[in-house]
Amino acid sequence: MGEALLSKDAVFESLAQNVAIQAVRAAHPEAVTNAKFDRGELSLVIAAEAIRAVCRTLQQAGYNFLEDVTCVDWYPSEPRFQVTYHILSHKLKERVRLEAMLESIDPSIDSITPVWPSANFYEREVWDLFGVRFHGHPSLRRIMMPDDWEGHPLRKDYPVEGYR
């Protein structure tokens, strides 16, 4: 069997020396709504309204590389959309996963392109395929689907044959 999943407080206690946990808890104590440490990976569930500030804090703490931004549609559950950020510190040789949960009505979150410009295309892909808006994005437009495409094809409620 896998490792037992710990509560947020137990994760914080067992990883008290972790740079990411120290930095985020010091700067944004209310931003972390949950934490997991599973199979050697730290995941922090962040309140959506704090994502840009938390990313900036992690960058200042030495997490210098944004690996990707992805999305999961948990339809029909609410909150429906999980936006996930994988962030790496080359110096510390550590990775942290940030997750933010968004409701199905007008799913939106702040863009992190002011922190990591490389988020540009990742956020465009999530917008194009899932319909999640990124506030403050410099050019939020389709990247994979044609400009006249209707809807967002990776949503679980998207018609299999497309809109007709």
Predicted regions and their residues:
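Terminal low-complexity/charged segments
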Residues: 1-164
